[in-house]
Each structure stands twice: as structure tokens, then as C-alpha cells.
């Protein structure tokens, strides 16, 4: 049986002025021995044990003892990776899916997964992880490493960029506990200009190669998704929005770097702004990412 994430219980104080704590206060003197004092002593002992348990209980969710059983996935890109979907009110996180939170602690994968902006919401990472968990042995837990930041260009994710460094720092923490199994990427809206779009494919391929070199894994599976097909053709200032060109550039990735796959966005809807996928679309998108990841992993698995 897989252990359920632990929950920390907080106890509200009963008095505005705290009583002396017999567990920690050296000045506390025991009462004369009597039935009443014996009962008080028993209650005090139970209180001490409770306080000790609360004090030593970790805020971090339980993780597998073997790194091989903790499959990690790095989530990078901009807002459509971070997620802007409406968060369901009745969340029931998968018992074998965790996220590395903003405090760099493992926690149940409730949404929002990301914390880049207050508007972070439902994301494709949730259904991706649930699909991967369903296909994995019961001993395996999926660990998500959310690093996406809305509104960011590819340049900030390239080698030695600020977001490159932040993602690698969080990845290093996560890899102390598990094994990286793949990287998920969704970005390009910020690069859909006449100056940036034509070189997007080459720059993305270079970023993937540099990232793999940095993490010492030249065949790490990398899955990228298309931008939404609902994006407007021109920006409010009248300049063309070259999202179609970005998608064409993304399509060149598998021919430029090995062990890469592309996920289409056809048929997926937006949340009303013609920019961000809605929750239903993100759920489907995440499943598509998982299917692409599984194909890459199967293709790169050693022959038996």
C-alpha cells in the first residue's frame, strides 16, 4: 500500500496567556502525589508526546525510499505550462503524484501547481502526471517540478538565463530524492514576433541540447506542445502575431535533436481570452503530453 501524504494538525490555544509547559519548562514543579496529580501527570505525558509528534512531523509529503521509484518531470515554459485554467473546487490529488512547492518541499499535487503569478490555476501537468502514474507500477510516485513563468521569452530559458538557472536549482534539489524521467515544454507566445519567430526552432534546439548537457543526460526525453490554434492573427497594436510560424518552428525540433516529440493542440479551447487554454483543454493536453512522453521512453528503453 502506498503511504498517504501526511497532514499537520494545528491546535488553537485555549488561553490568551500560555500556561507553563511542563514538557519544556525546567521551573515546573510536580504536585504532591495523589489520584488527582497522577491523572494530571498522565495527561501531561500525553500532551508531551503529542507536542513532540507535532514538532518533529515533517511538512513534506512522504516520498519513495528508492530514488528509482520517484519519477521526476521538469515543467518549463510560460503561462500555458504554468496553467491559467479554473481550479476545480473539489480537488482530490492523486496519492502517487507530488509537486515540489515554492518552499522546495514535496507536497500533494493540488492546483495550482505553479506559483509564478497569483493568477496561476489549473495546468496540463496534473493530467499528465495522473496518466503517467496510472501507467506505472504501484511502487512508483510521480514528482512534478513546476518552474514555468508566464509571459517569458525563450531567451530567459536559454543557457545561463535567469529562468534557466532557477529551473536547474530546483531540479538539483528534486534529484536528491528521485530520478528525472523527462522534460515538458510549452512556450512561444512571447516569441511570436517578426524578429523572433523565424529563429525560434534553432534557438529551441540549442536550448534543449544545452540543457541535456548541463544535466548530463544527452537522451533525456523532451516534449514540446503547439501554441493554441485559437490565438488572434494580429496584436492590439496592429503587429502580426506569428503563432503559426512558431508552431512550424516547433515542428522542426525532432529533426534537430533526438528523443524529442511534439504535441498538437488541435481541437483544444481557450478560456475566453484567445490566449490561454481552458481547464478542459489542459486536461486533454496533459494526456497528450503523457502519451508522447511514454512513446519516447519506450523508444529509448534498453532492449531486453
Question: Where are the model-predicted features located?
Answer:
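Cell-envelope and extracellular/periplasmic
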Residues: 60-304
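Boundary at the C-terminal end of the N-terminal hydrophobic targeting segment
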Residues: 55-59
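Extreme N-terminal basic, low-complexity initiation segments
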Residues: 2-11
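Bacterial N-terminal signal peptides
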Residues: 41-53
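Twin-arginine (Tat) signal peptide motif
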Residues: 33-42
Amino acid at each position: 500500500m502506498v503511504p498517504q501524504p501526511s497532514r499537520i494538525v494545528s491546535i488553537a490555544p485555549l488561553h490568551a496567556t500560555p500556561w507553563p509547559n511542563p514538557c519544556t519548562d525546567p521551573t515546573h514543579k510536580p504536585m504532591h502525589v495523589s489520584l488527582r496529580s497522577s491523572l494530571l501527570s498522565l495527561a501531561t505525558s500525553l500532551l508531551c508526546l503529542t507536542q513532540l509528534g507535532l514538532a518533529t512531523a515533517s511538512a513534506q509529503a512522504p516520498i519513495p525510499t528508492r530514488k528509482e521509484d520517484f519519477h521526476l518531470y521538469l515543467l518549463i515554459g510560460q503561462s500555458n505550462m504554468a496553467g491559467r485554467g479554473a481550479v476545480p473546487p473539489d480537488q482530490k490529488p492523486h496519492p502517487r503524484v507530488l509537486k515540489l512547492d515554492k518552499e522546495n518541499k514535496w507536497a500533494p499535487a493540488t492546483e495550482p501547481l505553479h506559483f509564478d503569478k497569483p493568477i496561476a490555476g489549473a495546468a496540463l501537468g496534473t493530467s499528465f502526471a495522473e496518466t503517467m502514474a496510472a501507467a506505472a507500477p504501484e511502487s512508483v510516485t510521480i514528482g512534478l517540478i513546476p518552474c514555468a513563468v508566464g509571459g517569458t521569452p525563450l531567451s530567459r530559458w536559454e543557457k545561463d538565463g535567469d529562468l534557466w538557472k532557477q529551473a536547474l536549482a530546483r531540479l538539483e534539489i528534486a534529484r536528491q530524492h528521485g530520478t528525472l524521467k523527462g522534460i515538458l515544454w510549452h512556450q512561444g507566445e512571447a516569441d511570436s514576433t517578426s524578429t523572433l519567430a523565424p529563429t525560434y526552432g534553432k534557438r529551441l534546439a540549442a536550448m534543449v541540447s544545452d540543457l541535456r548537457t548541463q544535466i548530463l543526460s544527452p537522451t533525456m526525453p523532451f516534449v514540446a506542445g503547439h501554441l493554441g490554434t485559437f490565438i488572434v492573427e494580429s496584436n492590439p497594436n496592429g503587429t502580426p502575431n506569428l503563432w503559426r510560424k512558431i508552431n512550424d518552428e516547433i515542428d522542426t525540433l525532432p529533426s534537430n535533436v533526438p528523443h524529442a516529440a511534439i504535441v498538437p493542440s488541435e481541437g483544444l479551447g481557450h478560456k475566453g481570452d484567445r490566449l490561454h487554454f481552458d481547464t478542459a483543454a489542459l486536461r486533454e493536453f496533459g494526456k497528450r503530453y503523457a502519451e508522447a512522453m511514454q512513446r519516447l521512453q519506450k523508444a529509448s528503453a534498453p532492449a531486453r
